Amino acid sequence: MSNGGAAELARLRHLDHCRRFRCFARELTEFIYFELSEEHPQGPAHGVRITIEGGIDSRLHRIFSQRPVLIERDQGNTTISIYCICNHPGLHESLCCLVCAEFNKN
């Protein structure tokens, strides 16, 4: 199975048991599994990475202001990477749970 196929299968498995209100597996995020060689600065390692598309958040603010104001926050893309340095490369189920926990901090 290719890394892309393994990542999709892991995402679906995580989705089946995750009970979080927000879950990376339900959202439209790019989810990949990777392996890094010993020559890589973070290697040898393996892990998962998600990329969350940015967006604009707008809200009307009336409290503590003489006039109603519109507050707009424009956020770019966010990338979350989890690196595992164990001796058994593979897409561990715990990596999906960790990336979901980090996703919920965003």
From Swiss-Prot:
Keywords: Early protein, Glycoprotein. Glycans are attached at N77. Coiled coil: none annotated. InterPro entries: Adeno_E3A. Pfam families: Adeno_E3A (PF05248). Belongs to the adenoviridae E3A-2 family. Not yet known. This is Probable early E3 12.1 kDa glycoprotein. It comes from Human adenovirus B serotype 3 (HAdV-3).
